[in-house]
Amino acid sequence: MSQNDLNKEKALVVFSGGQDSTTCLFYAKKHFKEVELVTFNYGQRHDKEIEVAKKIAKEQNLKHHILDMSLLSQLTPNALTQHELSIEDNDDGIPNTFVPARNLLFLSFAGALAYQIHAKHIITGVCETDFSGYPDCRDSFIKSMNVTLSLSMDKDFVIHTPLMWLDKAQTWALSDKLGVLDYIRHNTLTCYNGIIGDGCGECPACHLRARGLKHYLEHKGEE
């Protein structure tokens, strides 16, 4: 499908208010005629995530769907839904921030919503390059979900992953190319400890984000 064709289409962005999904929001605004957002409330570590997502959606004048997925917090204790747990890697190398089946469920419900609002395109900010040990962020999983969603609803869905092969520095570069680097830096919430913008500087998410920004700014203009 050509860019001219995409400009006539509708897209649904899986949106958390973090760096990656907000970059996807602006990517979608550039490439699609109509954009809506879906945020999942799954009892995440910080309610502030939902408030940040609402604020950004309002500022960008986009229709924002918030779906209750609180049942996820009942399935397994992990550091994204259980506030009292510290963030660390498990013995199998998968971080205890991993929520089993999260992206499987999120994309399933995003597909159901996309069906209802007549959106062919679903955009998610998952990324395999800065692989954090999450098996449901892999390209192979996304491709399988694309087929499954299309078959389950007899619709020709397209799942877009514009960040899949970008590292964090390249993700910052994309936001700069879209003209929103400063907006994303100061208004998004990536920090596991709930601090907006540059975050706490201590958690794994902040380290990854800060390292990527530093690398991008140091090498900006070299290519």
From Swiss-Prot:
It holds the Pfam family QueC. Catalyzes the ATP-dependent conversion of 7-carboxy-7-deazaguanine (CDG) to 7-cyano-7-deazaguanine (preQ(0)). It catalyses: 7-carboxy-7-deazaguanine + NH4(+) + ATP = 7-cyano-7-deazaguanine + ADP + phosphate + H2O + H(+). ATP binds at F15, S16, G17, G18, Q19, D20, S21, T22, T23, C24, L25. Belongs to the QueC family. Binds 1 zinc ion per subunit. It is an enzyme of class 6 (ligase). The keyword Ligase applies. Its cofactor is Zn(2+). This is 7-cyano-7-deazaguanine synthase. SUPFAM superfamilies: Adenine nucleotide alpha hydrolases-like. GO terms for biological process: queuosine biosynthetic process. Homodimer. The keyword Ligase applies. It comes from the Bacteria. Keywords: ATP-binding, Ligase, Metal-binding, Nucleotide-binding, Queuosine biosynthesis, Zinc. InterPro entries: QueC (IPR018317), Rossmann-like_a/b/a_fold (IPR014729). Pathway: Purine metabolism; 7-cyano-7-deazaguanine biosynthesis. It comes from Staphylococcus epidermidis (strain ATCC 35984 / DSM 28319 / BCRC 17069 / CCUG 31568 / BM 3577 / RP62A). PANTHER family: 7-CYANO-7-DEAZAGUANINE SYNTHASE. GO terms for molecular function: ATP binding; ligase activity, forming carbon-nitrogen bonds; zinc ion binding. Zn(2+) binds at C191, C200, C203, C206. Its EC number is 6.3.4.20.
